[in-house]
Amino acid sequence: MKIVINSHAKSNIALQHLLESLKENDIDYCDVIVVIGGHYNLNNYEITKNENITYIRVNHNSIDFTGLITLLELYNNTNEYYVYLHDTCKIGKNFYNKIKSIDLTNVSSIKINKIFSMNIGIYSQKIINEFNDFLLSKKNTNENECMKYKSINYNEDYIFNNDKNNKVLDNYDGWNYTGPIDYYNTGTMRIVEYYPNFDLYKIKANWGQGHWTLNN
């Protein structure tokens, strides 16, 4: 499995925090793909590589779907699986062992939480290809439309919820969190959710507090 990080041009603080946690926990030998949305000036995908990390800068910002759209348009190995993360995540020391031990037999996607998975989890290239029309309908190349894509008819977990072979990792349905705090010292308050089944922390700015924010 490859690790895919969904990020944005304005989210470098969060991205570097996640990448540092990967390095601290010996994930240097994994293939990591970082998809960075919001580079509207680009005519096409811009791809660079640094050691085990491939950086893909893209000219759209499709919120959680930016990375999935990029995998749809650039990758075609139908035997591949991806661990899909937001840049506002941090991994624990058991993260790699947990993903390595997951049984992918007859599975095309895996949620990390039975209720809300925030599009975080495991996707096969096959299921990404199967939801081609849905993903392309979420492709946003207009910076001024981002909030609309976040808050109106957002379809969070749409692929997970419509994949007949989807599973929930360890059947987890808990909500373990701390905060809110200004986690990144950027002025944005966040809660920190912990998913023990994945050994993953999600640093979350939108948690049902009554308004949506795209601030970093």
Region roles according to the model:
Residues 1-216:
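ER/Golgi luminal nucleotide-sugar-dependent glycosyltransferases, focusing on the catalytic module
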